[in-house]
């Protein structure tokens, strides 16, 4: 709620004031807050949310290794996500960006390869 957002904002402002070059690692903010808070502060500070981005990075690395071994092309791959939690949506975002970057498709087109 509002008090939660005020607390996070107060912390981020204090961290920026005292440690202007700090990298902030957000952890366990939950589905309703993780993406929203990450999106709010990413343009302003160096930050990372393990729930959204960490699991996605590890999963993407595994997919990239599998594609290298198997020869599967990004534009030919299809992905099914089971669950819509913070990690699942983060994984889907990482995969969508990778498809777009590696195949030249728009992110909208890339998203059509993910269910």
Where are these predicted regions, by residue range?
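Metallocofactor- and cofactor-centric catalytic cores in central/energy metabolism, strongly enriched
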Residues: 1-75, 81, 86, 90, ...
């Amino acid at each position: 709620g509002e008090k939660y957002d005020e607390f996070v904002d107060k912390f981020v402002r204090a961290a920026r004031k005292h440690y202007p070059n700090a990298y902030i690692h957000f952890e366990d903010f939950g589905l309703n807050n993780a993406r929203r808070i990450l999106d709010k502060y990413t343009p302003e500070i160096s930050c990372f949310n393990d729930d959204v981005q960490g699991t996605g990075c590890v999963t993407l690395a595994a997919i990239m290794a599998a594609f290298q071994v198997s020869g599967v092309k990004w534009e030919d791959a299809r992905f099914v996500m089971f669950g819509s939690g913070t990690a699942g949506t983060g994984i889907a975002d990482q995969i969508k960006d990778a498809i777009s970057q590696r195949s030249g498709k728009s992110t909208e087109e890339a998203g059509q390869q993910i269910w």
